Amino acid sequence: MRHYLLHGLTYLLALTSAALVATHVHAEDDGLEVRIGYLAWEPARGPLLSNVIPEPEDAGLRGAELAIIDSNSTGRFLKQSYALSAVRTGTPEALLTQARALHEQGIRLFVVNAPAKELLQLADAFPDSLLFNAGSASDELRGEQCRGNLLHSLPNRAMLADALAQFLATRRWQRWLLVTGETLDDLAYAAALHRSAGRFGAKIVEEKPWTFDNDQRRSAQAEMPLFTQASEYDVVLVADERGDFGEYLPYNTWYPRPVAGTQGLTPTGWHKTVETYGAAQLQKRFEALAGRWMNDRDFAAWIAVRSIASAVTRLKNADARAIRTLALSADLPLDGFKGRKLSYRDWDGQLRQPIPLVHPRALVSTSPQEGFLHPVSELDSLGFDRPESTCRQFAAAH
């Protein structure tokens, strides 16, 4: 408890000093200029065992750029302007060095697309700043490793797994065969699926680790049916975040069953096929800017910047502490083109949001599913609810 209180006091003192300096905002006669830092580093994925379509190298960055354009479009009427200082590095050490340089220039608002370890280093290095996590789905970042100055615009694995489990429950596909890869991310995704199975009454009839090191492009039709032999199941769930083998499970299972998880029917924060509630206009504007489809990291960066801009519009300043306080209140509903107002949970900083369930070229459904009720918000049926949260930094620093 003493450890959490010390973290909270350090955070509050740092933000108070930042409020006195507030060098990231230039209040001039002609308006307010808000500078936002974008920090990105992604470790090498290593050799893949399939020819999976790679993630765009500018994933996330283009979403932040579009949000700056959108914010300036509305901000000019209020004499507010927004500028993005983007940093993409090849090493985590360079990321911290470049972030320090932006911090020395007075920037106190950051959108970060980086793994959990680097996010924690940045959050601890800049306690007077407000960071938005737009790149890591780590459940630990929303739990015991949370930080009071770190909000999360990207859904975590628990939210994704719950969204999928709710849909499977509505279809009464409650017997799962779980196939898990060997990476730490795969194991974390599998752990989230185990948690969701317990929450929504599913049974994992068998869990099979994928330990093969061969390319499945030529042998999937022969090997996958034998590998997926097991007790009767309704659906095959796959935890393969890198894409080593999961793409070859659909249509190759022992029983003719659907595949879901990281491949097949996939829960995600955003997808090209999301078009309702004005989303089609956002998709078109993004494609005109980036020349490609908008993905979940692009949307996470976009909504993070829009969160800042929406708060600045209400506050008429860009103080990091004030933005955090407003974001965690009920007074900053955000329009994310998902059919519901989005908001940040005040117990762990996670953005509440509906989760699309998609396959590569179509939207299948959106969770939370009808009938999954909650006393406060149905969106809180996805992920860690207040009673089960292990995050203590927000209680100390709120």
Question: Which ranges hold each PLM region?
Answer:
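Bacterial N-terminal signal peptides
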Residues: 7-20
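Extracytosolic ligand-binding ectodomains
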Residues: 3-8, 23-398
